[in-house]
A protein has these predicted regions:
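Short beta-strand segments
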Residues: 39, 69, 93-100, 123, ...
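Phosphate/pyrophosphate-binding loops at sites that engage ATP/ADP/AMP, CoA/4′-phosphopantetheine
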Residues: 18-33, 182-199
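Conserved catalytic cysteine-centered active-site region
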Residues: 2-5, 9, 13, 40-92, ...
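Glycine-rich phosphate-binding loops at beta-strand->alpha-helix junctions
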Residues: 36-45, 198-214
Length: 220
C-alpha cells in the first residue's frame, strides 16, 4: 500500500507537468480536447489518474477517458496508436499521457538479475503529447500489433506482498532474432510501405543483449 501511495502521488505530479507543457506547446484550446488517454503499468489507481488530470487541466467534463494499464514497455507506442484512432473517430484533439514510477517497483533485498537489470534500465518519468486532426507536426500514418502465442511469461509483474516484482525471460533476445524482422515488415506493409523505406528505427533498449539482437536482425 505504501508503494502504491507513492506511485499515485508521484505519477500524478509528473503527468500533470508533462500535460501542461504539451497543451501549451500544441496551442490547442483546452475546451476542444475530446479524449484523454492515460498509460501506465507501475501502479494502480481507481478512479484512474486521468480523472484527476481532466479536472486539474481544466478539460471539458465530457472528455472521454481511456486508461491503458498493463502494456509495460509497449504502453507508450500502443497509446499513440489508440490516440490516433480516437482522433480519426472523434475529429477532435486528443491528449496522450504516460507516467511510470519504476522506483516504486524496486524490491529491497531481491538480488536476482531481473531486479538489478530493471532497476538499471528503468526510471521515473512522464511524457505527454497532443494529437489533432490537422497540424504541421509529425503524422501517424499507421500502426500494427502482433501477439506472440504463449509469451505471457516473457515479461511482466509478479504481485507479491512487497509490491510488483519484475519478470524477465532469458528468451527475449532470441525472440527479437526470430520475430522482429517479420513483424517490422508486416507493420510497414500495413501502412502501404516496405521495411526498406525506413532509414531509421527506434528500438526498445532492453539491455545489451537485446540491442545486439536488433543489430544482427536488421544488419545495423
Amino acid at each position: 500500500p505504501e508503494k502504491n501511495a507513492v506511485y499515485r502521488e508521484a505519477a500524478l505530479a509528473l503527468a500533470l507537468s508533462a500535460s501542461e507543457r504539451a497543451l501549451e506547446a500544441s496551442g490547442v484550446a483546452r475546451d476542444t480536447v475530446g479524449a484523454i488517454l492515460f498509460v501506465s503499468s507501475t501502479g494502480l489507481a481507481t478512479p484512474s489518474l486521468d480523472s484527476h488530470l481532466i479536472q486539474r487541466l481544466g478539460l471539458p467534463a465530457t472528455t472521454i477517458r481511456l486508461p491503458i494499464w498493463g502494456l509495460g514497455c509497449a504502453g507508450g507506442a500502443a497509446g499513440l496508436a489508440r490516440a490516433a484512432n480516437l482522433v480519426t473517430a472523434l475529429g477532435t484533439p486528443v491528449l496522450l499521457v504516460t507516467a511510470e514510477i519504476c522506483s516504486a517497483t524496486f524490491m529491497h533485498g531481491d538480488r536476482t538479475k531481473s531486479n538489478v537489470i530493471a532497476t538499471a534500465l528503468f526510471a521515473d518519468g512522464a511524457a505527454a503529447l497532443v494529437l489533432a486532426p490537422e497540424g504541421d507536426g509529425p503524422e501517424v500514418i499507421g500502426s500494427h500489433s502482433h501477439l506472440v502465442e504463449n509469451s505471457e511469461d516473457v515479461m511482466g509483474w509478479t504481485v507479491t506482498p512487497e509490491g510488483l516484482q519484475v519478470v524477465f525471460s532469458r528468451s527475449i533476445p532470441q525472440l527479437v532474432r526470430t520475430l522482429a524482422a517479420d513483424v517490422a515488415a508486416a507493420a510497414a506493409r500495413s501502412a502501404g510501405l516496405e521495411a526498406r523505406d525506413f532509414a531509421n528505427f527506434v528500438f526498445h533498449p532492453g539491455g545489451a543483449k537485446v540491442l545486439s539482437a536488433y543489430e544482427e536482425t536488421f544488419s545495423l
